[in-house]
UniProtKB/Swiss-Prot annotation:
Modified residues (N-acetylserine): 2
Encoding gene, per UniProt annotation: GNA1
Name assigned to this protein: Glucosamine 6-phosphate N-acetyltransferase
Molecular function via GO: glucosamine 6-phosphate N-acetyltransferase activity
EC code: 2.3.1.4
Claim: Acetylation is one of the keywords in the record: yes
Note: Present with 2550 molecules/cell in log phase SD medium.
Family designation: Belongs to the acetyltransferase family. GNA1 subfamily.
Assembly description: Homodimer.
Amino acid sequence: MSLPDGFYIRRMEEGDLEQVTETLKVLTTVGTITPESFSKLIKYWNEATVWNDNEDKKIMQYNPMVIVDKRTETVAATGNIIIERKIIHELGLCGHIEDIAVNSKYQGQGLGKLLIDQLVTIGFDYGCYKIILDCDEKNVKFYEKCGFSNAGVEMQIRK
């Protein structure tokens, strides 16, 4: 499945702050983020790598992606896959999909599934043995359509 006409996908950039935070508000509270802090975050994400046996292939630890409307240069969707090097599975890689959000103006166009597909491709291309995510009960059917299956229970503790 490819992106609909008029959209493209790319890595998140420093100039995306306002649109990304606005898009993430459909998911949860975002709070106040200064342009300076966002710039530092993007720089960190662009430099952080995961140790790799195959030095020919750089494994980016953070892979924040956005789907953009070409007509307006508006961020329509955002998400991230974070790559973790584990001890188990012979020092295997595990991908964690995080912060999937589609701008309310663009929902219902299949962009969320396309974004998930792209993030899964990134994870498997890096060699992840599995890709996991946490979601609200109301989103289970969506993630099942994306090929995910229930594999346990999420637990949390908050301060």
